[in-house]
Amino acid sequence: MQQLHSRILGEGDPLLIVHGYFGNGDNWKTIANNLTDSFEVHLIDQRNHGRSFHSDEFDYELMVEDLHNYIQYHQLKKVHLLGHSMGGKTVMLYAVEF
């Protein structure tokens, strides 16, 4: 199972930020730096984006599974989710399923 790349900043409750189409986690670094006093911010690169793995398979079901695997791998129990555009749909579908 391949894991998504992320940059983790700060301390506190985990906040996972999921970027939009053609973006990557670095797009949110400036905002993340303003949240690090209150949150452990995870700037996630979705599959086929940034430094995460590339795959011929690419759909929302798989991106939700990738996010779930990421949360399990990092042993996160309760998370805050923030998604933009494609990342917004990914986190909404994740919230419905899990």
Task: Give a label for each model feature.
Residues M1-Q3:
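N-terminal cap/lid segment of alpha/beta-hydrolase-fold proteins
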Residues K77-F98:
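Conserved hydrolase catalytic core segment
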